[in-house]
Amino acid sequence: MAAAPGGSAQPAGPGPRLGFSTADSGVGMSGLNPGPAVPMKDHDAIKLFVGQIPRGLDEQDLKPLFEEFGRIYELTVLKDRLTGLHKGCAFLTYCARDSALKAQSALHEQKTLPGMNRPIQVKPAASEGRGEDRKLFVGMLGKQQGEEDVRRLFQPFGHIEECTVLRSPDGTSKGCAFVKFGSQGEAQAAIRGLHGSRTMAGASSSLVVKLADTDRERALRRMQQMAGHLGAFHPAPLPLGACGAYTTAILQHQAALLAAAQGPGLGPVAAVAAQMQHVAAFSLVAAPLLPAAAANSPPGSGPGTLPGLPAPIGVNGFGPLTPQTNGQPGSDTLYNNGLSPYPAQSPGVADPLQQAYAGMHHYAAAYPSAYAPVSTAFPQQPSALPQQQREGPEGCNLFIYHLPQEFGDAELIQTFLPFGAVVSAKVFVDRATNQSKCFGFVSFDNPTSAQTAIQAMNGFQIGMKRLKVQLKRPKDANRPY
């Protein structure tokens, strides 16, 4: 190492590779011979995901490709933890934010590396939020306010990268705008400082400042609106994040119903029927109670006792569970708080409460946190169904192509649930990059739902592409689509 005039150490030979592990960097063995200085990066530097890399290229091979856009802070090729094999992708961080933007603009889907069939992917890593945590939606603006007025309003909270007032085709303001800050902290400060803080001139209510919807949320909302316009989508779906809280509320309400059941004129079956109204929020549809069940109900609990009570509810698309061998309903544990079980039902009739909750087990695998309370309270009886991807009957399985890159299994299920009971839904993912292949399969339990979904969603445009929705080909065909 040779000392430069300014006192900083300069390497005597070839410089060390940047962005590799400490072992690669060659840490000094003594205080007289310190290791190379660690490169500094901007506080708002962007971590890039690089995909479609030949598996024969390592960090040293990739470095010349990216160095022309700026100094590299870190470059790491992803490898399988168990096998150590190259995954065909990497993470890249430049010292300067501008360097990352230049590299993304020049390389993303612009150049195909030797041996690859698709162009290289260079885009912000998922952990960076793609700027979604910095972009704000501003509502309830005055119609007279333009971009400069909005900038002055938000300027005290940090550096504004973008500011756009949404306008109608005639140029008049829609009373809302998008504002993008340089960092997440600045965006959060603006939300805390401005949301609901004032009412702008000409606005009907206080100012709205919140994070803008993500691409995934916008695409999903557009699909659901499309389904609603065609009459296939009636009640709005319960947001996935709210399911856990809602199921907890159901179980709490159940306790109140059981207490009420001790009063005169309200038997266990009537209490179950009342409770079923709240289960309807989970896409369950009304079905009449079988006469055999009413015949076996204890005195005072028949339909005539409460003439205005709605009929109990069955499960959309799923049949009743097989009753237990002792003839008692599967939910008899509900009546252990001072209540005697009513007489055994006929062998062909399942308890309505157990029947209603049965369908939730089909979704418990997809949303374990949401349905955990229900699964615990109502254990599922043994099922002969396999756990792998299931298909519906012939004519009920759909192939969907041109899905948004951000869509996963959960979004696919929620998109096609409006058309009927979904048996299974799967988005195919590249094993090497863990990125969506933008196609998948959805299976319904009946051909009518499948045909309705095709009519509603085939050709539906998202961005620059249109969805392709068609029946999956038979298994003996060469291709499934």
UniProtKB/Swiss-Prot annotation:
It comes from Homo sapiens. It is found in: Nucleus; Cytoplasm. Expressed mainly in kidney, brain and testis and present in other tissues albeit at lower levels. Also expressed in fetal kidney. One of its GO terms (molecular function) is RNA binding. Keywords: Cytoplasm, mRNA processing, Nucleus, Repeat, RNA-binding. Residues 1-34 are annotated as: Disordered. RNA-binding protein implicated in the regulation of pre-mRNA alternative splicing. Mediates exon inclusion and/or exclusion in pre-mRNA that are subject to tissue-specific and developmentally regulated alternative splicing. Specifically activates exon 5 inclusion of TNNT2 in a muscle-specific splicing enhancer (MSE)-dependent manner. Promotes also exon exclusion of INSR pre-mRNA. Residues 46-127, 134-214, 396-474 form the RRM domain. The lineage of its organism: Eukaryota, Metazoa, Chordata, Craniata, Vertebrata. This is CUGBP Elav-like family member 6. Its main location: nucleus. The keyword Calcium does not apply. Residues 1-12 have a biased composition (Low complexity). The gene is CELF6. GO terms for biological process: mRNA splice site recognition; regulation of alternative mRNA splicing, via spliceosome. GO terms for cellular component: cytoplasm; nucleus; ribonucleoprotein complex. It comes from the Eukaryota. PROSITE patterns: RRM. Belongs to the CELF/BRUNOL family. The keyword DNA-binding does not apply.
